[in-house]
Amino acid sequence: MKSPISLLAAVGVASAASPQTLLSLASTASDIIDASPFLSFHRDIVQIPSISGNETAVGTFVAEFLESHNFTVIKQPVPSSSNGDPNRFNIFAYPSTSPSQGRPDILLTSHIDTVPPFIPYGLHDDANNNSNILISGRGTVDAKASVAAQIFAVLDTLESNPTASLGLLFVVDEEVGGLGMRTFSDNSTLNPSPSPYHTVIFGEPTEQALVAGHKGMLEFPIIATGQAAHSGYPWLGSSAISALLPALSRVDRLGKIPEAEGGLPASEKYGETTVNIGRVDAGVAANVVPSSAIAEVAIRLAAGTPDEAREIVARAVRNATGGDEHVYCDFAAYAGGYAPQDLDTDVPGFEVTTVNYGTDVPNLKVSEGVKRYLYGPGSIHVAHGDNEAITVGQLEEAVRGYKQLIEAAVQRARRT
């Protein structure tokens, strides 16, 4: 098997030339992408829209690519949302010649879905430095950069170490609740207990740093009910908005209130717990007293458990409303929630950081003692924006980073 990261299309020079030499002969950004199988693969998957719920097309492309590189590919069906693609699937793959046959020691995983809207692939040339060529479009960072870099890191590793026990897992639905990873995790055939792997490497945009952990998550609506009436005679009704506002004001400040005074906990590692009231829906018209109001809340937990946070929030709502039973938190509306996730950072040569965003890490059940790493190219600060973009240099560095994590895991296994 040729080395996928270093094998470039012929451009009239000897095959012994270095990748840097070959790329320097390309005259445009498009030529550079075309000349690199790795960058071309990244381009190809970004060009396929895969907004959560509609991942089948990109999944098919990735699966066929892996099969063409002598991987055994298992397509695990994942239930669809009410308006989603009923044929979507997770991809679990491993080298067909692997001695572990579906029980890899080392698992690399990321997700193939993206947030909306689809933004076409674009290139922004840098005549002075090929590494600074900017690649824009939805998924260029989150998380198709990780998908591409993980695949090519594995292919490169297998060329030098054909018996390395490696597996790849690419899931759907990460951006909207993690159903893809939970479906894989709950499958006792694909994810048996105890875990067959000793290392899991998760791919998300971390700016090429190893992540020591990320905050926990709790989502829920706060609901208020009232009585509709003509706005000229508001005393004939009961405003759900007026009832909801004191609760929202209190909940919105819980991350700033000391825990001893009824606030949400902080930690030295993750800082403050943060509260975001992301959406409010209420009423039907300005001249009607609103009979209902609902606010969607997301809390990023710096410490404690979801159950502990629920108790704090519920108490705050009761106190703010004087115990009004018409204002309440519907914690059953969203399943799960999770505590802060502590991760491994024991591989030298990386910057180490923490992040505030959520990942599929808590959705994958693993045995105690399994190493979990979170690493990937690009910045979360552009990942969901209309300016989502990544450089060629960041992509290429991520391949090296994933290979370094793989090699550390291989060497650790040899020592045990």
Swiss-Prot record:
Species of origin reads Aspergillus niger (strain ATCC MYA-4892 / CBS 513.88 / FGSC A1513)
Similarity field: Belongs to the peptidase M20A family.
One family from Pfam that matches here is Peptidase_M20
Catalytic machinery residues: E174 (proton acceptor)
The answer to whether keyword Signal applies is yes
Taxonomic path:
Eukaryota, Fungi, Dikarya, Ascomycota, Pezizomycotina
EC numbers for this chain: 3.4.17.-
Q: Which GO terms describe its biological process?
A: proteolysis
- One function term, GO molecular function aspect: metal ion binding
Show which residues constitute the signal peptide. 1-16
Positions that bind Zn(2+) 1: D142, E175
List positions binding Zn(2+) 2: D142
User: What is the protein name given in its UniProt record?
Assistant: Probable carboxypeptidase An18g06210
Coarse class of the protein's main subcellular location: secreted
Kindly list the GO CC terms recorded for this protein: extracellular region
